[in-house]
Structures are given as C-alpha cells and as structure tokens.
Amino acid sequence: GDEANVHQAEKCLGQLKELSLRGNEITAQDVNYVLALSMEDQESAIVQLDSDLICNTINGRPVKPKTIGQKKYVDQIRGNMITFGIGPAGTGKTYLAMAMAITAFRSDEVSRIILTRPAIEAGENLGFLPGDLQSKVDPYLRPLYDALYQIMGAESFQKNMEKGLIEVAPLAYMRGRTLDNAYIILDEAQNTTPAQMKMFLTRIGFGSKVIVTGDVTQKDLPMGTKSGLDVALQVLKKVEGISFCELTSKDVVRHPLVQKIVQAYEVYEKHRSEERRVGKECRSRWSP
C-alpha cells in the first residue's frame, strides 16, 4: 500500500498495543477513535487519556475521559469553580460530572453532593401527574440515580442519602439556600429559565464547586421562553472562575449509530440556522 498509509497504520497499531499492555480491552470504538485521531496526527493522545483515571465504578470499571473533548472538560472542572459542559446526548457530560463529584466527596474535598435538574420537561406539569411529590419527581431524576448506582453502588448511595450527604432534588428546592462545601451538579440546564439559572448560580457558597450540563438543541421549554443556559452563555462568558466546555459529536461515546444521529441533527440545525439568517436579512432589506 501507500507508504504514508502504512506508516499511519503502524502508528495506530502501536497506540492500540500500548492500550492493550496497560490492561485495556480494545473495542471497535477504540480503533475508530485512534483512526480518527491519526487523521489529525494526534493518535498518541489516546494513551494520555488512558492515564487520567477519575475513579472506578462499583464493579471495578475505570472511569476515564475517552476523547480529547472529554479530557478538556475534566481538566476545566478541576481548574474552575464553575464549569458549563455543553453538548449532545452521549458525550458523557453528566456521567463524568458525577464521577468527579463522587471522587471529590470520597477524598473529603467536599462534605456533600447535590444533584438537581428542572422537574418540568417534555411538556409535563407535576401538578397534573398522579402520585405524591417524590413519585412525581423521581422519573425526572432517574438518570442521575442511575449514574450514582453505577459508580457508588446502591447501598452506599442510600446510606449517604439517608445521612443527607447526597441530595437529589428538583431545581425549585434550591431557592432560598446557600450551598457551602458541596459539589453541585445542575443537569438538563437548557430547560431552565433565565431566572432559574440566576437563582441556582447565586446559591453557591464557600468551598463549593459547580458543574452545569446541558444540550442547547434539546429544549423542552414553552414556545417563546428563553433558555437560562443560552442567557448564561452570553452573560458569563468573560467572568473569571467560570469555564465553558463545548462537546461535539466527536465526543459521543455511545453506540456509533448515536454519533451518526447527532451529526445528522447538527447538519439539520446548521441549515435551519442559515435559513433563518437569510430570511431575516431578506425581511430587513424589503421592509419599508
């Protein structure tokens, strides 16, 4: 074959061999990602990612950043008081945030973990759902529970929750509180209003760290309602101590088909945005 291609293949195989020697089981996803990195002469980054162990799950599986974007996200969390992780489904933004929070909690960097998300999504209103408040909010918080169970184990999670050291609650429960010495994660932040986002960010006390995650393409807010995440991106971009990390379809670590779906929607949204821009220019040009 072509000499350049052969050399590229050798480098990729060398990195995969290094991963294997480190005790990793090489997956098709690893192969595809090393190939993608090699196109940008960054194939050696895969070994650097493998060196960044955040924690282990209850089953002993290591939790590490799997892409360059995820590595950047984890580094920004470590270096800032408030980090916004923005990206599509499957990029690991919430799971990695959970892993970072649990690691900080285990090492006594913080005394508790607080996880929250807006309770109203997909057009549903809690007042019209059957059951008591806990049963109403649980479905909205289930993804957070799932990640905690996987990393901590159900028994450890329940014990810490009973002691008040881990709290999983709707965003409305944050009002009027000051959250000191805590690791706080706001998930699905695209479904907050600007007032809710401001309320949340002003709850932060001394010794706390905050991660805000969201996907600006998946808003469930009523038509015409601004997203608190969009406003925060505009207002807080230059505030020291706050970082914004944008994950993309390149950082999707679920089934390869999910990555293709995300990419297809990115193209669609780009076309829609361009159509709106052109339409706005035309209306402006022809208006009296």
Listing of model-derived features with the role each one plays in the protein:
Residues 275, 279-288:
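Positively charged, low-complexity/disordered segments
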Residues 1-50:
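Interdomain "pre-motor" coupling segment immediately N-terminal to P-loop NTPase/helicase cores
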Residues 58-72, 76-186, 190-273:
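Conserved helicase motor core of SF1/SF2 NTP-dependent helicases
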Residues 12, 55, 245, 279-282:
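Generic recognition of cysteine residues
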Residues 38-68:
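Conserved loop-to-helix interface motifs that mediate assembly, gating, or partner/ligand docking
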